[in-house]
Amino acid sequence: MAYTKADLKHDLAAMGLTGNETILIHSSMKSIGTVEGGADTVLDALMEFFAEGLLLLPTHTWRFINEENRMFDVRRSPCCVGILPELFRQRPGVVRSLHPTHSMAAYGKDAAAYIAVSYTHLTLPT
């Protein structure tokens, strides 16, 4: 049995979420299971559910931005953390931060204001 958009939104509400929160989601389509319509349905559900809040997904590029490839293009550089963030960053109304290796994408309430300062956070080597 495949999940539907309605199932996903119901499950979010069942977790006690209201949709007006600020939420950072680290995602995995494999962990979600089979969804009618695939990744686009998951993103539709998240964006509709959190329409009054702020939805954040990491759009990290650390796998691609390195000594050999130092160029980061906020509009074109693909992310390396899954299909959901990659599709999310390309959707209308989603804004992406300027951090060259650990960017974030945001949608919803005050998304542009949140993203405007997020790239200034330090990322230190481990």
Can you describe what each PLM-predicted range is?
Residues K5-L8:
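N-terminal basic/disordered segments at the start of proteins
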Residues L12-A14:
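Short amphipathic alpha-helix with an adjacent loop that forms part of the alpha/beta core around
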Residues G16-N69:
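N-terminal active-site beta-alpha-beta segment that forms phosphate/nucleotide-binding
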Residues I32, R70-R76, A113-Y119:
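Flexible, glycine/proline-enriched loop segments at strand-loop-helix junctions
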Residues G38, F50, G82, A105-A116:
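Glycine-centered helix-coil hinge/cap
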Residues L56-L57, R96-T101, A116:
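General beta-strand structural signal in soluble alpha/beta enzymes
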Residues N69-G108:
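Ligand-binding beta-strand-loop-alpha-helix segment within the catalytic cores
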Residues T120-T126:
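Conserved small/polar residues in nucleotide/adenosyl-binding loops
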